[in-house]
Amino acid sequence: EAAAETRPDFRLLFNLFSFSNEEEFILDGLSEGLDLWVAPRELDGTARGRRLKALPARGSEIFTTTRLQNNYLLGIPSPWLAAEEVRGLQAAGFDKAQVTVDPAPLAPFDINREVLRALNFDAAADVDTVVAAAAVRLVGKDGSPALIKAWRLCDTAVRGFPSIMLYGDNNWGFPWYRLLVRPFAPDIGKIPEAERAYYEKYMTVTFNNPNLVDLGTDILWTLMTRDQADAAVAQADRATWKSLDEADGMLADAIEGAEGEARAVFIDQLDRLRALRCYFRTLRNTAAWVAGVHGYIEAQDPAEKERREAMVREMVDAEIANAKALAALFESSKTPFMPVDPKGETFNIYGTNLPELIRKKVALMETHRNDEPRIDPDFMWRLPPDAGLDPKAYMKY
């Protein structure tokens, strides 16, 4: 209101990410000049979705952006899903959308960008026709069927992969918690702090954030419940790996018979799909950590406790193998399949030392593989190193 006194057309845009408890009151108060950002999937047929879609009638505009879920990597092909995302916005009543695409120098053969370009000029463009023309242009008529099939399989895998909440649904959330380089140990808190420092240095957390020892929480929020984690693991295993494995084999075979530019395209796409598999497996294993460790702690039945412990051991072994595969791909591939800062890692991005950090992760997981699953329930009450207080006396309060 103060800004509108000098600029009558002033508008404030915000989102409700951290205000779920206050959402009812905030939505009731939205009016002219107070605009809301929402994710496209929120504008559904539920009571909440209908309420959001009714806001413009009160002068509160709705804004959104669209990007492919879990798309932290660069140049991941899922053109049919990309088209559906954009057309879904149009069907929801949007006449403008901010669409995120990967830069051509980093993803020169990105079919998603081709589809979005076509839709920008012709909303009724036939996606299959656009995809087929791009494939022929990239690898020739003979190689195009294999490339199109690999794109279709990858599209299927991306659709099938579940939401891993803040870790996977936001490009900025994934590097914040250093999932690629932190050890998924059964009892993270058992690892000496000095041995955890290499990745905690760039985690976006405070010294007493429970996420340091619990992948299921962040500050006072629950990122993922045990039931949600169980469902995510089951969905990933059911709907993702078969399609990615088939696409991998198809592209590997295509490379053997290709030459020149076509061969370069097939190699580029294969590297990106293998990176996607590593990325998805890390997210899947994040959910498996939550399901296994929390399940073990909560279990009362001995048989259930044993099952959850076995789940934790399987998760550790799976992530060790996956981490080794990612390090090998990073060191051998010339394809820029993920954001990397050549000047060094930061809170928002990994650096060229990624393989070195992954090897530290693997070593810690191998050392602590058989630890009993545990989460320190009082971690958030810990003192900073330089507090100058007796921890035992402090905990009495």
Regions flagged by a language model, labelled:
Residues 1-397:
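Substrate-binding groove of N-acetylhexosamine-processing glycoside hydrolases
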